[in-house]
Amino acid sequence: MASTHPSPCTESYDPRFDQLVLFNAELELLAEGFRWLEGPVWFGDHQCLLFNDIPNNRTLRWHKQDGVSVFREPSGFANGQTRDRQGRLITCHHSQRELTRIEHNGDVTTLVNNVNGKKLNAPNDVVVKSDGSIWFSDPVYGLLNDYEGGRQTSEQHPALYRLDPSTGEVAAVARDFEGPNGLAFSPDETKLYVAESGGAGESNPNQFIREFEVSADGKSLVSTKIFHKISPGWADGFRVDEQGNIWCGAADGVHCIAPDGTLI
């Protein structure tokens, strides 16, 4: 059963943030007792939330009427996921090292599991562009221990990929990463933001959100810069709202970052 709590821990650093939230809103605890949660996806048409408990190797479903139930077990140590333009669920899997799509009839389609004959690492997070193309990050985190999906050997460098689901063509759009993580497009899709989580440890300098300029044809990336450095901790998953603000998971909660890179 869900419970509500007052939310006195919201901190505003900029008047722009005050226009985004209701400070008398309450924080609602939907469920607890999990090990490590990732990949929340809201299905408004079904009024339910899907999310992954990675170490327990299962995807869970929350609904207001009946609470939490198991949606998929085993999940292939599923991590990030999203919906495509047809409302289907796209999921990153660590143990199978692949991206899948659940069709409307319940069938599961493997979208990609290798590039040029070499296995993917452990796909981490995914976003779908308005043209239907699927962009995903592929770090090695899910190969490093049994907790995240089982120790396996990496066959290629961490990278960011674009998949055309209509043709099956997959191409690396950026390889200069240590550990690509969450990603999302700006509202007009001229920019792609990607979390560079680097290696583990607060002292690692390669932990920040990068901003990429998307090419005119929307199929590649043409330039990059450091957009924002999260502190404390490092950037994990995030989404961009209709005003271009980034809502990003961090070590101490959720950070809201304005389009100019300011923590607000």
Pin down the residues of each PLM region.
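Sequence-structural signature of mature extracellular/luminal beta-sheet repeat domains
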Residues: M1-I264
